[in-house]
């Protein structure tokens, strides 16, 4: 029963195993944690959208300020000027990775993603997830699928360890 619940009883979000909203936070947030920390994900994402031409010059978009947790707006041009230098050599990779997520959902849905509460993973995931996301290379269907296998594999490993320690009746 717990295994079925983990997989939402076979009813996936928007018909796919990949829940784009959550995966965006935990993959991009971990992969670029050294540059973004816990508070830069949404601002840098808006900057990437502006760089890619998905937002017009002077665009002001709704976003949650991850420092104050307040909803507000941000100027995409100002964010581009701030975040492009901060990511330095990794900027073009960041833009490419953000665009993968941006193209996997409707623009309005992705816009609402930036009103959520940001990347809030544990420090353990910030370390492990960052390493795994970097090793997996650019965000692609394959790399995301492999990263998403981590949870079920860890659960399976836990069950196998329980069985070994206490027998199948436990």
Predicted regions and their residues:
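Multi-pass membrane glycosyltransferase architecture that uses lipid-linked
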Residues: 1-170
